[in-house]
Regions:
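Helix-turn-helix repeat elements of alpha-solenoid scaffolds
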Residues: 107-111, 116-141, 158-167, 186-195, ...
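Juxtamembrane proline-rich low-complexity "stalk" or linker regions positioned immediately after a signal peptide
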Residues: 28-86
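Short helix-capping/linker turns of helical repeat alpha-solenoids
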Residues: 150, 175-182, 205-209, 215
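Extended amphipathic alpha-helical segments with heptad-repeat/coiled-coil character used for oligomerization
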Residues: 212, 216-265, 269-280
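Alpha-solenoid helical repeat scaffolds
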Residues: 154, 158, 183-186, 209-216, ...
């Protein structure tokens, strides 16, 4: 792998940041795309005869778009892909061709020397950052419009959330009393609207641990009372996987295209920006239990959380933090910690393992064996996706655990995380 896989990492970070920008722009009119010198952004380019022949030969697959874009590489400077305030399917097809033309140097480098050859490219992105971000925002707006027009209340609710129509989302949650819609409103609305949805969520799913954890922020009960209710939970369901399955039900303008890549990465950004419940108040009494009954409650909540098998890689860390102050429990939790550490390391490795696939996609080349890490992970949920990829060989599992602990200064997840220079200003973490 090249020492500077920054091209893809920049693409990932840039388009993931689209999610944050999108949340700030919700409900506002579409802003004009970046103007082009010739003012031609209002009309998509029509492919010439050679480009039409390439598309006819390959269709709309990545290799077809790349072939159609090749003649543009002779231009003195690459033409940046152009966006309109409102994009039709034809506009997206033109955007894909123009993206592929701009990425021609990267495509040639990959063809000739693989990832290592990208080192020779100039550091400036071949497609401007603001165009990447604008494309992601446009595609999220397209998702919102498609979902808002559907008949399913859940799909409409996801569309309302993306559109920033908060009052309508809260009204939909209260009218339908659908736990998925109510959970979405509780987790994504703000202020009193979120509090109203959270109270309704707890009413509808009183034994859902995630609903209870969100409710503790608006209902300051004694720690022992909260721990007792959490220990009796029968589910751990944020309904996040359902939301992202709905988001993935809207196909990109063209499968395998640059726009499809931009949409995938924008959804990853939404997933990464999903708010977590505050765990500080839950963990505080368990960091140094003041009594044996309180220590037993902390252990009971940890056991319950583990048994409910959260479909993410973050929540098990809460269980480890709950029992961290009780050394006598460590033997019972060691195998669980090793499993979580192996999966966490596999997740970290997965980022690098899929760099080549995403590099190829960004350069309009078809990956030889697509892994679909972004879309599949969000569709299935983190825990299901990564646990299904754990090696069965004990030695391979041990190697993953060893590497994970090495990155934590030799510490297990059952140990307190290594101190960081900015730990004092960082939020509490398990």
């Amino acid at each position: 792998m090249p020492s500077r896989p920054w091209l893809l990492r920049l693409l990932l970070l840039m388009l993931a940041a689209v999610a944050l920008a999108w949340l700030a722009w919700l409900g506002r009119p579409a802003e004009p795309a970046r103007a082009t010198p010739d003012g031609a952004s209002a009309t998509p380019q029509t492919p010439g005869p050679a480009q039409q022949a390439a598309v006819a030969a390959h269709g709309d697959r990545p290799e077809g778009m790349a072939a159609a874009a090749e003649p543009a590489s002779a231009a003195p400077a690459s033409q940046q892909p152009r966006l309109k305030p409102v994009m039709s399917e034809a506009d997206w097809a033109a955007f894909d061709r123009e993206w592929c033309a701009a990425m021609q140097p990267a495509r040639e480098a990959l063809r000739q020397g693989g990832l290592a050859a990208l080192e020779k490219l100039p550091p400036r992105p071949l497609v401007d950052d603001d165009i990447q971000a604008a494309a992601g925002s446009q595609l999220l707006r397209r998702l919102s419009q498609a979902l808002s027009a559907r008949a399913s209340p859940r799909e409409r609710a996801v569309g309302l959330w993306l559109a920033g129509r908060e009052a309508e989302l809260l009204a939909e949650a209260q009218a339908t009393r659908d736990p998925v819609i109510v959970a979405l409103a509780a987790q994504r609305l703000r202020g009193e609207a979120s509090a109203q949805a959270t109270r309704l969520w707890r009413e509808l799913e009183p034994t859902n641990m995630v609903a209870l954890l969100h409710a503790q922020a608006i209902d300051p009960r004694p720690a022992a009372v909260w721990l007792e209710s959490l220990a009796s939970a029968t589910a751990y369901e944020p309904h996040l996987t359902t939301v992202f399955q709905i988001l993935h039900s809207v196909p990109a303008p063209t499968e395998g295209s640059p726009a499809a890549l931009a949409q995938d990465i924008a959804l990853v950004g939404l997933h990464a920006a999903w708010p977590l419940f505050e765990v500080g108040q839950l963990l505080k009494p368990c960091r140094r239990p003041e009594s044996a009954p309180l220590a037993r409650q902390c252990a009971a909540v940890a056991e319950r959380l583990w048994a409910l098998k959260p479909n993410d890689t973050f929540s098990p860390r809460i269980a480890f933090a709950l029992v961290r102050a009780q050394p006598a429990l460590r033997p019972a939790w060691e195998a669980r910690a090793r499993h979580a550490e192996a999966m966490a390391q596999l997740e970290m490795d997965g980022i690098d393992d899929n760099i080549e696939e995403l590099m190829l996609r960004s350069a309009c080349l078809a990956p030889p064996a697509p892994k679909g890490i972004m879309s599949e992970r969000l569709r299935l949920g983190d825990a299901v996706y990564w646990s299904g990829r754990l090696p069965t060989d004990p030695a391979a599992l041990d190697a993953l655990v060893s590497r994970h602990r090495a990155a934590r200064g030799g510490k297990s997840l059952l140990d307190a995380p290594p101190a960081a220079p900015t730990a004092a200003s960082a939020p509490a973490r398990p």
